[in-house]
Each structure stands twice: as structure tokens, then as C-alpha cells.
Amino acid sequence: SGGMIADALKFFGADISYYARSEKEAATAKGYCFLPLEKLLAESEVICCCLNKNTVLLHEEEFRQMGNRKILFNTGLSPAWDEAAFAEWLEGDNLCFCDTIGALGSEQLLNHPHVRCMQVSTGRTRQAFDRLSAKVLANLSEYNG
């Protein structure tokens, strides 16, 4: 999802920087700037976490590097952060957006004034439902021979 988000934001004129385990040729070809995590966190106004489930990237030090007056989006299935460090960061002038409690990490944070959580998976589109249904039917047909 990170690549699609970057492409959409670029369309609207955003300067795109990213962090990954390694620099991506396709991203470089689009003019996206690969940065070390600490530099990306310090320089970006908006940060989108698009990580695999149970991948925690943001701890106390990373939130310190982010500083204040930031917007954090999480499109993952689980939190991209250590909960205690995240809760402390939320007390600053920051905002967090996510789609589900699973992505937020704690039901206790739902009513936090700096959290916006829809509690509905943004990946649950009609097209995704149709694709999943077709996949299940194909698997059943293959299993039954």
C-alpha cells in the first residue's frame, strides 16, 4: 500500500521520501527520495506507516526524532509502534489516523483527542470482497477435484 499512497500523494504535488530496508529502483525512477529513518522522521510533516503485521518500527527514540506537530497514518493491520512511546507522543501537538482498532493497537486510545480511527477496514472494498470470494471458491473447487 505504501507505493500506491506515495503515487497518489505525488499526483497532488507532495514531495515523497521513504524508508525501507533497501532503496527501491522503482521509487527512485519516480523521483522519490530514499532516506535513513531518523532523517525521514525528523524532516517529514506527514508519515505513513505501511508495514507488515506485527512489525514495530517506532519506539521511544523514533518518536523523539519525529518531534511535534506531525501527522501519522497507519495502514497496517497492527500498530507500527511501541504503545507506551506512542501514547506519550500523542500528548504533544500530533495526530494519528488509522482505520481499525487493530491498527491503533488499543481500544483505550479510541477516544484520545489526537486519534482518528474509523473502526472499519479501508481494505474492505467491494472489489476486495469479490476477489476473496473468487479465491475461496477456486480453492474449494481445487480441493474437491
Model feature map: region roles:
Residues 23-107:
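Rossmann-like adenosine-cofactor binding region
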Residues 11-29:
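NAD(P)-binding Rossmann-fold cofactor-contacting core
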Residues 97, 102-145:
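C-terminal helix-to-coil terminal segments
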Residues 1-13:
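Glycine-rich adenosine-cofactor-binding loop
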Residues 16, 34, 72, 114-117:
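Conserved beta-strand scaffold positions in the cores of enzyme catalytic domains, especially
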Residues 8, 17, 61-71, 142-143:
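P-loop/Walker A phosphate-binding loop and immediately adjacent motor/lid segment at beta-alpha junctions
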